[in-house]
Amino acid sequence: LNLGVGAYREYLPIEGLAAFNKVATVQGLSGTGSLRQALYDSISSK
């Protein structure tokens, strides 16, 4: 893996490869609670 700074590594940093940082996923335990939290988060982020 060429990081562009002259250092080669066999593994990626904890953030992963920047080209793939476009999608995020979340897993919840309960259906209704997860829907409520998703709605709350979408309203509060605006």
From Swiss-Prot:
Reactions accelerated catalytically: L-aspartate + 2-oxoglutarate = oxaloacetate + L-glutamate
Enzyme class: transferase
Entry's Gene Ontology molecular function annotations: L-aspartate:2-oxoglutarate aminotransferase activity
Keywords for this protein: Aminotransferase, Pyridoxal phosphate, Transferase
EC code: 2.6.1.1
Superkingdom, natural source: Eukaryota
Cofactor(s) the protein needs: pyridoxal 5'-phosphate
Functional description taken from the UniProt entry: Important for the metabolism of amino acids and Krebs-cycle related organic acids. In plants, it is involved in nitrogen metabolism and in aspects of carbon and energy metabolism.
Oligomer and partners: Homodimer.
Protein family per UniProt: Belongs to the class-I pyridoxal-phosphate-dependent aminotransferase family.
Remarks, miscellaneous: In eukaryotes there are cytoplasmic, mitochondrial and chloroplastic isozymes.
Protein name: Aspartate aminotransferase 1
